[in-house]
Each structure stands twice: as C-alpha cells, then as structure tokens.
C-alpha cells in the first residue's frame, strides 16, 4: 500500500524515525542497521517500506535497502516471528550476514536477538534455509564505488541516496567515473 517514503528526516529515535513528506509526518519503525544508514535530521531520506494493518493500528516499517525489506518479509512468514522480532534480527547484522547465518544453521547467532530464543531461531533456519534469495554481488560484500558516492554527495545528495544509486546495476556497468555519475543521476532523478 505504501511502498516507499521520501522526505525530510525530522527525528531519529531508537527503533524509529520521523519523516516529513510534504507536510505529512510519518512514523517509520526501522532496524538499527537502517538507522545507521540514515543521515541527520534535516537530511533528505528515502526508505522502502512495508505497511502492516492491524485492527487497532497501522504500522509502517522502513528499510534502507530492498534486500533488508525482502529479508524482513521472509522473517515475518516464519511462525512465531512478528515485526518486532524481525527488526531485532535485522538490527543484529546486515541482510547478507543474516542470510549466511540462516543458511549456515548458526542458531546461536540468531538467538542473540532480543525476543528470539533457540527454538524460534531453529524454526527460522528450518523454514528459510532453502527459500532465501541468492545474494547479489553488492549484498555479498562487493565494495561500493566511494569515489562515485563522494561525487554525488558533492552534488547535494545524501550518503544514503548516493550509496543506493552507486549499487544500481546500470551504474556499476558504466566504465568511467563520468559515465557512472551520469547513470547515477538518471537513477536519482524524480520519475
């Protein structure tokens, strides 16, 4: 329903951010990983989101990357894992590391998340081990083009926006820095 939020970061708190989108302020629950990716209040931020509708509330969950959102949705599909537990897991480590832990059946690592015991961690491994999508090159730890990120930041984009654009496949394929900048600007341009 609400697939993304792009606006001015109003406040960062433990587990949530407030984002002003043209006069409407959204409270978006996030993982610690996403909180670290976001800038400071006043910066323009962009989050991919998932809206959960309950009888008594609407809860918006936001993530810095599509990979983090996909892993969040996969974790929600596991019996006994709710949104809070999924966020706690995503706060432990980056999505690629969590995926490695699940595939490697590292139950002790998963059980370190608040609210996730060994029994739930075992269930996560059992249900997701073979279902998680393959990691992309960037998720697997390929370095981000820091020169491109710095150039985009010099043009006024936030660190988060610059990193997201730098990881786009079209941008990564461009041979020279100038061509990567042009490709990144195409990705960052409003639709």
From Swiss-Prot:
Disulfide bonds: none annotated. One of its GO terms (biological process) is DNA recombination. One of its GO terms (cellular component) is Holliday junction resolvase complex. Its main location: cytoplasm. Residues 1-64 are annotated as: Domain I. The keyword Cytoplasm applies. Residues 140-191 are annotated as: Domain III. It is found in: Cytoplasm. Residues 136-139 are annotated as: Flexible linker. InterPro entries: DNA_helicase_Holl-junc_RuvA_I, Hlx-hairpin-Hlx_DNA-bd_motif, NA-bd_OB-fold, RuvA, RuvA_2-like, RuvA_C, RuvA_C_sf. Keywords: Cytoplasm, DNA damage, DNA recombination, DNA repair, DNA-binding. Residues 65-136 are annotated as: Domain II. The RuvA-RuvB-RuvC complex processes Holliday junction (HJ) DNA during genetic recombination and DNA repair, while the RuvA-RuvB complex plays an important role in the rescue of blocked DNA replication forks via replication fork reversal (RFR). RuvA specifically binds to HJ cruciform DNA, conferring on it an open structure. The RuvB hexamer acts as an ATP-dependent pump, pulling dsDNA into and through the RuvAB complex. HJ branch migration allows RuvC to scan DNA until it finds its consensus sequence, where it cleaves and resolves the cruciform DNA. Belongs to the RuvA family. Has three domains with a flexible linker between the domains II and III and assumes an 'L' shape. Domain III is highly mobile and contacts RuvB. This is Holliday junction branch migration complex subunit RuvA. It comes from Thermomicrobium roseum (strain ATCC 27502 / DSM 5159 / P-2). The gene is ruvA.
């Amino acid at each position: 329903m609400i697939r993304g939020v792009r606006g001015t970061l109003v406040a960062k708190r433990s587990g949530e951010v407030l984002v002003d989108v043209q006069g409407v302020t959204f409270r978006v629950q996030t993982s610690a990983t996403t909180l670290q990716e976001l800038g400071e209040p006043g910066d323009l931020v962009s989050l991919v989101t998932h809206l959960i509708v309950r009888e008594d509330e609407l809860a918006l969950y936001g993530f810095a990357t599509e990979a983090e959102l996909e892993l969040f949705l996969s974790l929600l599909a596991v019996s006994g894992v709710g949104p809070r537990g999924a966020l706690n897991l995503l706060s432990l480590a980056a999505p690629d590391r969590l995926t490695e832990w699940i595939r490697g059946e590292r139950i002790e690592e998963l059980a370190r998340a608040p609210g996730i015991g060994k029994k739930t961690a075992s269930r996560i491994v059992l249900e997701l081990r073979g279902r998680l999508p393959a990691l992309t090159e960037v998720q697997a730890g390929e370095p981000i083009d820091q020169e491109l990120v710095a150039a985009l930041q010099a043009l006024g984009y936030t660190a988060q926006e610059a990193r997201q654009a730098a990881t786009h496949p079209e941008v990564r394929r461009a041979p020279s820095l100038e061509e990567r900048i042009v490709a990144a600007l195409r990705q960052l341009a409003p639709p």
